[in-house]
């Protein structure tokens, strides 16, 4: 495998910064730094584990490393957050300055990586103890050596809560049950029971069905919920075009396009106040999981770790027979386009 330029850049930057820090004096008697810099859904589903870390070390002692654009979410959840700007990931001098300030200001005694993988951040945190999952992906396995203690997941294909349980047991040094780290954030969000919210995007295009297929699902929604409005949410040009196509395919229907018209927390509120959520593998699907909001998840493969098996969520995947009738150059994935209207209708009926 050829290493991507970004990984080579990160490796060189981290090595040079690490060498520079050998000439700096940092104390290691200060805060607990917790790395949680990946996606929205990951942050939400790990919220109970985050609470347990705070309980163990005290809120005033625990700081979460998060990407700048997720800082508001972390603070909303009650965390002390250190924002990591995107520019600092690419610029050597910005990264050097940021890492120096973090080590100097917070004097970390422990670095806990609660993500499901590893990256170059671990190399430049100067802490007495650095604990996290050992990531054997070719491009990042070089960073495993910076841990003072690392571990592997018991089963690489296990469900996401089992992975979080593995992380929790290793960094908290306690035996845990899945129930111990089951997140419940209903108390954080306003809850209601009106409208149907559809998230029209995901982290990858092949996880999103064609608007032609979504049109058929929406027609089923209106049969069962004729009085409800449908609200489309998402962000970015691709999702704006997707929503536009849906409205063109279903004129004169009660469909409201909120794509690119809400910030993250406003989109969260639309979901938690809804009667039902429909979406692909995404942060909003995980929001339903942590708030017990009824929802339908559309998956290429329902065995993936993030397909939560709980009563308030119905996960539906492709039929055994692949449907090749959907012709869409923008959304051509045959698996996601093979989720039958019948299975969607059945999921609607079960959640009603």
Task: State where each predicted segment sits.
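Positively charged, low-complexity intrinsically disordered leader regions
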Residues: 1-29
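Active-site donor-nucleotide binding/catalytic segment of nucleotide-sugar enzymes
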Residues: 34-38, 134, 183-242, 301-303
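Short amphipathic alpha-helix
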Residues: 43-54, 69-72, 217
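Conserved nucleotide-sugar phosphate-binding/catalytic loop shared by glycosyltransferases and other
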Residues: 60-94, 254, 315-322
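Short internal beta-strands
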Residues: 61-68, 131-133, 230-235
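Conserved nucleotide-diphosphate donor binding/catalytic pocket of glycan-assembly enzymes
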Residues: 83-178, 195, 199, 204, ...
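Donor-binding and catalytic core of enzymes assembling or modifying cell-surface/extracellular glycoconjugates
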Residues: 93-99, 213-300
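Nucleotide-sugar donor-binding patch of glycosyltransferase catalytic domains
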Residues: 133-154, 257, 289-352
């Amino acid at each position: 495998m050829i290493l991507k330029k970004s990984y080579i850049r990160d490796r060189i930057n981290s090595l040079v910064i690490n060498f520079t820090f050998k000439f700096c004096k940092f104390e290691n008697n200060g805060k607990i730094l917790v790395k949680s810099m990946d996606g929205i859904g990951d942050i939400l589903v790990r919220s109970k584990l985050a609470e347990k870390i705070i309980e163990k070390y005290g809120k005033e002692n625990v700081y979460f490393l998060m990407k700048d654009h997720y800082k508001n979410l972390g603070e909303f959840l009650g965390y002390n957050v250190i924002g990591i700007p995107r520019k600092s990931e690419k610029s050597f001098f910005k990264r050097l300055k940021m890492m120096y300030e973090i080590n100097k200001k917070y004097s970390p005694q422990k670095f806990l990586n609660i993500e499901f993988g590893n990256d170059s951040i671990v190399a430049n945190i100067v802490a007495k103890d650095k604990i996290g999952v050992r990531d054997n992906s070719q491009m990042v396995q070089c960073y495993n050596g910076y841990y003072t203690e690392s571990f592997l997941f018991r089963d690489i294909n296990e469900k996401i809560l089992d992975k979080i349980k593995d992380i929790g047991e290793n960094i908290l040094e306690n035996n845990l049950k899945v129930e111990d780290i089951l997140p419940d954030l209903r108390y954080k969000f306003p809850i209601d029971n009106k409208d149907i919210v559809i998230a029209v995007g995901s982290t990858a295009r092949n996880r999103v069905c064609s608007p032609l297929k979504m049109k058929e699902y929406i027609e089923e929604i209106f049969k069962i919920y004729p009085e409800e409005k449908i609200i489309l949410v998402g962000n970015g040009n691709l999702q704006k075009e997707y929503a536009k196509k849906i409205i063109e395919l279903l004129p004169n229907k009660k469909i409201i396009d909120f794509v690119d018209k809400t910030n993250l927390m406003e989109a969260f509120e639309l979901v938690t106040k809804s009667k039902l959520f429909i979406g692909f593998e995404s942060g909003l699907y995980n929001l339903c999981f942590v708030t017990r909001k009824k929802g339908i998840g559309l998956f290429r493969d329902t065995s993936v770790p993030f397909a939560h098996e709980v009563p308030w969520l119905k996960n539906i995947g492709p039929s055994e027979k692949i449907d090749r009738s959907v012709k869409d150059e923008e959304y051509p994935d045959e698996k996601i386009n093979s989720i039958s209207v019948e299975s969607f209708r059945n999921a609607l009926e079960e959640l009603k």
